[in-house]
């Protein structure tokens, strides 16, 4: 961009994002995320051997973030298998090296962060994919 040239693409993108948020009705977000949390509980994710929930963060907008340690396999390996099923998770030390090193023995953690675009079916697909990935790794 030249000096003084407005960022038209950014302005238009922000406008479309605002329209999308209004279309989704922000007040429905909390209900959506609570439903996803129930789907997480109904799935087998919390019962997968070696996948231990260490942190469940409830955000003000009703969104949940789940952080797991992996015993017997590396979280990056799990992430690679999930990627084969088009599932993205965050792995590593998540900019919290001292605490993650302490809880994971230096291996890192696996974080699941459902979004407004995540469906309950996505949660069950994630559960199935996690089970398949871990069976292959153990």
Regions found by a protein language model. Name each.
Residues 1-138:
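Pyridoxal 5′-phosphate
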């Amino acid at each position: 961009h030249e000096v003084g040239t407005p960022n038209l693409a950014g302005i238009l993108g922000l406008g479309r994002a605002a329209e999308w948020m209004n279309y989704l009705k922000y007040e429905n977000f909390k209900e959506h995320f609570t439903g996803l949390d129930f789907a997480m509980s109904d799935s087998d994710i919390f019962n997968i051997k070696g996948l231990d929930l260490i942190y469940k963060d409830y955000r003000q907008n009703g969104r949940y973030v789940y952080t797991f340690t992996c015993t017997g396999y590396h979280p990056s390996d799990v992430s690679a298998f999930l990627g084969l099923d088009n599932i993205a998770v965050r792995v590593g030390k998540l900019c919290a090296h001292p605490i993650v090193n302490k809880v994971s023995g230096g291996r890192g953690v696996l974080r699941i962060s459902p979004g407004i675009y995540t469906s309950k079916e996505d949660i069950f697909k994630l559960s199935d994919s996690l089970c398949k990935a871990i069976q292959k790794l153990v």
